[in-house]
Amino acid sequence: MAITKDQTGKLSAQVYALVRACPKGRVTTYGWLAGAVGYPRGARMIGWIMSATPANLNVPAHRVISKEGVLTGSKAFGAKDRMRTLLEEDGVSFEPDGRVDMKRFGWDPRLDLNPDELREVLDSAQTLRVNPPDTLLRLLNDDPASPFKLSDPL
């Protein structure tokens, strides 16, 4: 099942709306976001979408980390430790090994929002206009790890 550019834009907007809903002082994961938009095995897809985040949408992308509490997207923030600094400014603290305590700071939209709140956040994505890059569309359609590629019949 291929995904169109329009569908990619709508999916990206839902992801960005969820990240914008993540409260200051909390973090979420690629996997939790993937599950919230209906693709529980799509964590890598969320990483691709996050790497294409338009600056004008004011998405607090620094709040998206790995399920282990590791700052896997930190290279996207330029200066070394910039992602960590942004999280610390949000009120997130770090363990001695540099990880975030996910039990303390984790925010899973499927658990921390009731179904009506989750639907409201996803519906709010309609106000976000996202023009995804062609590279994202190619990844979603062609990469073996894409949930859209995985759903193709053998």
Language-model regions: role of each:
Residues 2-154:
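Nucleic acid-binding interface residues in structured DNA/RNA-binding domains
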